[in-house]
């Protein structure tokens, strides 16, 4: 179930994150490495300063929690700074 959620989330970043990075991160889902896929996707989002909507931020947060990540650790702790504030 988390694998499909990760792929659906990743699709939202098409055109906003270079496809080589997006595809590379999401490719881990094929190998049952969903945790790694989400972590790498979030690292790329942070590294390339991809602007997030509040909804995208919440979706990432919920998914990370469901997968057992500690939200106080990188890369998750840096995502809030990327939320579009207007």
Residue ranges and their predicted role:
Residues 1-86:
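C-terminal-biased regions
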